[in-house]
Design a protein with these regions (language model features):
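A conserved structural/catalytic subdomain of Rossmann-like adenosyl-cofactor enzymes
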Residues: 1-192
Length: 192
């Protein structure tokens, strides 16, 4: 039996958590399973199956990933990485690592995909420092928190939002995107 497994799952529905259960089943006791999932699996919509998973396995970490992570694959699903320790019940007295890693230093280049804008190595180093606990905890970026099996496992449930960084321009941009989405939806442009 393997001690480590990493998988990418970008489908819809609760089949993702069933897949995670299968992956963890095949790992040795204490083996580490790392999976990229839609954020809904870590949020409220995945509560029942996730709670069942945590009766048998430990959630070590959950990190929200950049919005355009799978841009090259034409998949628009918001994702997170979840890290599990197999066959060891989740201990509600131990902390789980949560991070909002939405900027990986890559930029979307039309017709070229995501490309490193020169910041990836520094960002990777920062993320490693956060994971191993050598970086100062920042409640707006990452933290460690004790959670129950019935709690959300999504970083956004626990990490604070710094509203001081929002501008009127940000608000206008979101409204314009939403207006365009509504128009395209009403015109049937988004269907099939």
């Amino acid at each position: 039996m393997p001690t480590e497994c990493a998988e990418v799952v970008i489908s819809k529905g609760q089949d993702e958590l069933d897949f995670v259960a299968s992956m963890l089943h095949y790992l040795k006791v204490g083996g580490i399973g790392i999976v990229i999932l839609p954020m809904s699996c870590a949020g409220n919509s995945g509560t029942k199956l996730r709670a069942e998973l945590l009766k048998h396995h430990t959630l070590l970490a959950c990190m929200t990933m950049p919005q355009n992570l799978f841009f090259d694959s034409h998949v628009g699903t918001a994702t997170c990485i979840m890290v599990f320790k197999a066959h060891i019940k989740h201990d509600e007295n131990k902390s789980t690592f949560f991070a909002r890693w939405q900027d990986d230093g890559f930029k979307v280049i039309p017709h070229n995909g995501r490309k490193d804008a020169g910041g990836w190595n520094a960002i990777k180093s920062t993320w490693i420092d956060q994971l191993d606990g050598t970086a100062a905890q920042d409640e707006y970026v990452w933290l460690k928190k004790k959670i129950k099996t019935s709690d959300e496992a999504l970083a956004e449930a626990y990490i604070k939002t710094d509203y001081s960084k929002l501008s009127d321009n940000d608000f206008e941009k979101v409204l314009k995107k939403y207006s365009l989405f509504k128009y395209m939806d009403e015109q049937g442009i988004l269907e099939g």
